[in-house]
Amino acid sequence: MTKANKVLFITQEITPYVSESEMANIGRNLPQAIQEKGREIRTFMPKWGNINERRNQLHEVIRLSGMNLIIDDTDHPLIIKVASIQSARMQVYFIDNDDYFQNRMQTADENGVEYEDNDSRAVFYARGVLETVKKLRWCPDVIHCHGWMTALAPLYIKKAYKDEPSFRDAKVVFSVYEDDFKNTLSDDFAAKLMLKGISKKDLGDLKEPVDYAALCKLAVDYSDGVIQNSEKVDESIIEYARQSCLLYTSP
């Protein structure tokens, strides 16, 4: 592989838009470090409902918004917003939708109750990022996915979007964290994630109902590298990545 000059970051959390955490700090600092090495970056995260748009100066990018993504036979408008972290000279794109992200937290609500449609939210987020990158006509060399909400991106990149100029030559890296959800995903999850170019065979041993470990293993199947970013990660995921000779443990 030639030198990675363009890096796409797809993550769940970035400070200062959400509270500091292991993932949010990496989501903030790693893209800046890569950019300071002279690389070109694009960074995406969901527009969670607890992000203050006025304080963080988010604004909609009209030319990128307006597409409808069909999930479970329902149209869901894709809204793209953008903001800048001035101290890092870094721009962040936000994937937004009234049904999935407005007035809603991350995995669970303020009472700790996990959202029943987390599977659909993950499908929308992954597809929303990839469709936006296509519109930008930008071709990353490396795509670095952080956290379970991004776990479908490797499958989509390597199957549904494999012939797209923006993605056909990209290498995919998946970072796992201690960010597991407790409930299983909906019983029709496999049907929801299907797109042209993806067959049931491509889902391997994915059996419903799908839990956190199974979702992350699906990401491992279609990644070129896996990074363990938290000390405490489901051991079955780590062993699965190790058997695939893909695992790198972050120092």
Locate predicted features.
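Nucleotide-activated donor-dependent transferases that construct or modify glycoconjugates
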Residues: K3-E20, P46-K47
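A short, glycine/small-residue-rich beta-strand->loop->alpha-helix junction that serves as a flexible
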Residues: E13-I26, N52-R54
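A short, Lys/Arg-enriched amphipathic alpha-helix followed by its capping loop at the start of a domain
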Residues: N29-R39
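Active-site donor-binding segments of glycosyltransferases and PAPS-dependent sulfotransferases
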Residues: T43-V82, L203-E208
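Conserved nucleotide-sugar donor-binding subdomain of glycosyltransferases
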Residues: S87-V142, G197-A213
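Conserved nucleotide-sugar donor-interacting segment of glycosyltransferase catalytic cores
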Residues: N118-L195
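Membrane-proximal helix-turn-helix segments that form the acceptor-binding/catalytic region
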Residues: F167, D180, G197-V226
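Conserved small/polar residues in nucleotide/adenosyl-binding loops
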Residues: Y248-P251
